[in-house]
Amino acid sequence: MIQLNNGIRIFVNHSMKKDIYIGISDFGFEKDINDGILGIAHLLEHILISFDNKYFNANASTSRTYMSFWCVALQKRHYEDAIRTAISWFFDKKYILKTDFSRIVLENYITELENEYYYRTEMYHCMDVLAYLYGGDLYNGGRITMLERLPEIRNMLSNRMKFLSGKNIVIFVKRLTNNILTLLTNTFGSIPKYPIIIPLDPQIQDARRKIIMMPCPFYTLLIQVDNTMNNLLAIICLVENYNLIDYETISDKLYVCISFANEDQYEYLLYNIKDMDFNINRIELDLGEDYIMNLYINFPWLKNDIFEYIHTMNTKSAMLLADLKKNMHNSILEHKFMIIYPSFTKLLYNITDKQNHGILVVGDVSFTPEKDPSMHHSNKENNNNYSKTVTKRKSKYVMYRKTPTTNNIVIDYTDSSFFDYATFYHVMKSKYEKTNLFSRLKTSTGMCYKHCFDNDDLNELINSDTFIRYNSSKPAVLYQYILLAYFVTERDIKELVDYKDAIELDMKYYSKNKILFGKNTRYDIRTKSMFVCGLIKGRKLSEKVITDYMWKLKSLGLIYYLTSIKLGISNTFYIFAFTIFPEKVYNFFVGLKEITNRCLIVSNKNTKIEEDDYSSLNKQIVIGIK
């Protein structure tokens, strides 16, 4: 580790996939709460990051407490250019920190934020309970209503850059040369050690004794513990050895977060935490650079190299976990915990945020642990007579232990469980992206999922009642597969919709088919979502060209993400994009010279009835399969 004079820490990681990774603590959207406009942090992230996708790949993220950015060159010879690109996001050509946003066209960025909101709510249920209970909203990424306050927002963006301080910045680089160290010193090293403008922290009180009913795939227990080094090390021990365990932070609060498929599992842990046996294998901190970076920026008091603590975690894990269990037990006795219950009834809510998202929050719930964990326990909710019997279970059935080696499961597109695994992957990606619990690799006939779940545990989770209901609550995930199957098979739309669990998507098999484009190039349907999808064909089309289309559409504020699948048929791609501007996205593709043939479907929301209307899709006039 190298520490610059202003407190910035630089780590060299030769095995890192990224070329440069920048983390900024105390810079997330919780700072928006006192500013009065939620989404400033996320908007700033979108404005700052800019790169040429012909030479680089890059991304950024904003959470409650931090912001992070990374960049990697597509070719090794452009490594130093990747470093310069990342630096250019924060500094001008004279190496002066960017604080002037007067010439930025904010409208496109804000509409892109609205499209991201739409994408995330269509693909997942994006609700941040902690942020809401501590003064924010259930969604804090910014909405299109920000267009009404542009002058204020420009000033807030400028002030937000002045929140930056050296002591809160961590930088990972793959290789460190004299030139790169000089670059980093002349740019990031010029940031003050302490911020020019000291931000006000939100007034946060402990959220106690609450049950939150909201759309989620599993039961989740959040127990507040002391924000200390020993507790952090104990949590890392658990994360390396168990699935569906992580931590959550907001301001200086730390929560242990554990998810379960069944209600009696969380109840057992709630009443028996002191007796839980955690088996910890060797700790190697093999969690990837994302997780390691998040440790530094979620816990800015962590000043030493986290790898210095591997010996402590391996030799003193029993002591660390005993102290953590005691802390969790005391927090339960003091009611410093929350329970998230899966609920998918839109009409069942008693609280709405400023954006009219509704959830059911039951406060002052009474939990009284008894000495005998096998005894009956009564939980009385607010104004309700409600009791549950806690079943004493063996601890091995409560926690989902990681397997020592990575498991692979290949699911054919034609398999009836394909959509279950596809949705499970999306859930893991959205909730546990940094821990890399569940990754995928496309094959010619299906998906290969890599995971560290025991097969019985994985089956229990995917076939649990809560996950099945969650899966059914997000029809938007299925639209792209239903319409893909419509284009590449001989089956009509009604058959596909009625039997969506048996959709055949074997691209290798259907590459033998020849698709004939009809005279009409546009078909309008009405569903529960807004999107544009269909087939495009052209000799000059490639995955790289379509990626360029995505970035152009994003820069115009028209979409957040564009999915594309290359078909076996020559020069033909299937595309799909959720958007709040379906007409504009359709017109964008119509105007592209590289596309010589197209058949696009434009979906608008069906406001009259709940049923989807595919009546315009007559197989004989849309396309021909030979």
From Swiss-Prot:
Tagged with keyword Protease: yes
Q: What residues form the catalytic site here?
A: 45
Q: Name one molecular function that GO assigns to this entry.
A: metalloendopeptidase activity
Name a biological process GO annotation: viral life cycle
Query: InterPro entries from the xrefs?
Result: Metalloenz_LuxS/M16, Peptidase_M44
Specify whether S-adenosyl-L-methionine is a keyword of the entry: no
Per UniProt, which keywords does this protein have? Hydrolase, Metal-binding, Metalloprotease, Protease, Zinc
Q: Where does Zn(2+) bind?
A: 42, 46
**Pfam families linked:** Peptidase_M44
Names of required cofactors: Zn(2+)
Q: Tell me how the cofactor is bound.
A: Binds 1 zinc ion.
Entry EC no(s): 3.4.24.-
Relate the protein's function as given in its record. Seems to be involved in viral proteins maturation by cleavage at Ala-Gly-|-Xaa motifs.
The family classification in the record reads: Belongs to the peptidase M44 family.
Stated name of the protein: Probable metalloendopeptidase G1-type
The source organism is Fowlpox virus (strain NVSL)
Q: What is this organism's lineage?
A: Viruses, Varidnaviria, Bamfordvirae, Nucleocytoviricota, Pokkesviricetes
